[in-house]
């Protein structure tokens, strides 16, 4: 079990410094791969459309996932509902590369997340804070991402979540060893993971940014805040020029600390996706609060 998990963590580590893009067709997947994406997320609808349509959002049709998988050579991810281990079993049977237990889809279980140790395939999970991140890792997640607020084109929540996680990690590194058990209780997280973070000053898995990233500047901002890479959902194919936007965001993640290059890649992209002021959303319409 531990050998398999170490392999899964290493697979996620190989995506570090890259961009993972949401795609809904094989054609979009090819655009993403040509632009330099390190992986794609196969979906029936991007988060902006899921948000607009409402209702219950479920795992994508296996036919769509298989078509996207056949179109590209880079890893393909797909989403399942929180707690829906049967959807995860189906995706594992399809030979998908990573499963995202995602708050963007309608939760199937409001009490329990999936036991990710029961699967051979690596899992990605969202987190708003260090406690959530360590609980998901304790369940077997090989990769963490900020939850942000998907489908809004508004990066503010992703920034908030990344800053919170980083601040809580920094705090752990200042504690004495005899204070770590109390910290584990406070975080509601496994003691061994809390101790690891305190000793190493980082999560034991990669932590990507996700949720509301709509421009190259957004992507570079998240990288400068300490993200290991970036997920872009609606920001590519809801923009005016998806091909140019995809290439620009990949370059922005690579050269995130080079303002001259960021200025160059941000030029002439056309209009970014339509955005939403998160303050105007009802509590029931917030995805990030799903899960615990």
UniProtKB/Swiss-Prot annotation:
A biological-process GO annotation: pyridoxine biosynthetic process
GO MF term list? pyridoxal 5'-phosphate synthase (glutamine hydrolysing) activity
Q: Which domain of life is it from?
A: Bacteria
Keywords from UniProt, A to Z, are:
Lyase, Pyridoxal phosphate, Schiff base
Q: Where does D-ribose 5-phosphate bind?
A: 22, 151, 212, 233-234
Q: Indicate the residues that form the catalytic site.
A: 79 (schiff-base intermediate with d-ribose 5-phosphate)
Show the catalytic activity.
Answer: aldehydo-D-ribose 5-phosphate + D-glyceraldehyde 3-phosphate + L-glutamine = pyridoxal 5'-phosphate + L-glutamate + phosphate + 3 H2O + H(+)
- Residues recorded as binding D-glyceraldehyde 3-phosphate, renumbered to this chain, are 163
State the family it belongs to: Belongs to the PdxS/SNZ family.
- Please state what the protein is called: Pyridoxal 5'-phosphate synthase subunit PdxS
Give the organism's phylogenetic lineage: Bacteria, Bacillati, Bacillota, Clostridia, Thermoanaerobacterales
């Amino acid at each position: 079990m531990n050998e398999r998990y170490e392999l899964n963590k290493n697979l996620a580590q190989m995506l570090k410094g890259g961009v993972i893009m949401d795609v809904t067709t094989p054609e979009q997947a090819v655009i993403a791969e040509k632009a330099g994406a390190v992986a794609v997320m196969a979906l029936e609808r991007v988060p902006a459309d899921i948000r607009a349509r409402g209702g219950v959002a479920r795992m994508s049709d296996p036919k769509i996932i298989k078509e996207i998988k056949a179109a590209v050579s880079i890893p393909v991810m797909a989403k399942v509902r929180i707690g829906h281990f049967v959807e995860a079993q189906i995706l594992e049977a399809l030979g998908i590369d990573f499963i995202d237990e995602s708050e963007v889809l309608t939760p199937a279980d409001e009490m329990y997340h999936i036991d990710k140790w029961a699967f051979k395939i690596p899992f990605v999970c969202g987190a708003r804070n260090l406690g959530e991140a360590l609980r998901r890792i304790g369940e077997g997640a090989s990769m963490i991402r900020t939850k942000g607020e998907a489908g809004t084109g508004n990066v503010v929540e992703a920034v908030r979540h990344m800053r919170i996680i980083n601040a809580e990690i920094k705090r752990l590194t200042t504690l004495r060893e005899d204070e770590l058990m109390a910290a584990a209780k406070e975080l509601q997280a496994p003691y061994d993971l809390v101790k690891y973070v305190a000793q190493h000053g980082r999560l034991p898995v990669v932590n990507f940014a996700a949720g509301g990233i709509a421009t190259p500047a957004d992507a570079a901002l998240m990288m400068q805040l300490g993200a290991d890479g970036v997920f872009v959902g609606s920001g590519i194919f809801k923009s005016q020029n998806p091909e140019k936007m995809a290439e620009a965001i990949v370059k922005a993640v690579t050269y995130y600390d080079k303002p001259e290059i960021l200025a160059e890649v941000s030029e002439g992209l056309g209009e970014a996706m339509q955005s939403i002021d998160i303050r105007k959303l009802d509590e029931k319409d917030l995805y990030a609060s799903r899960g615990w």
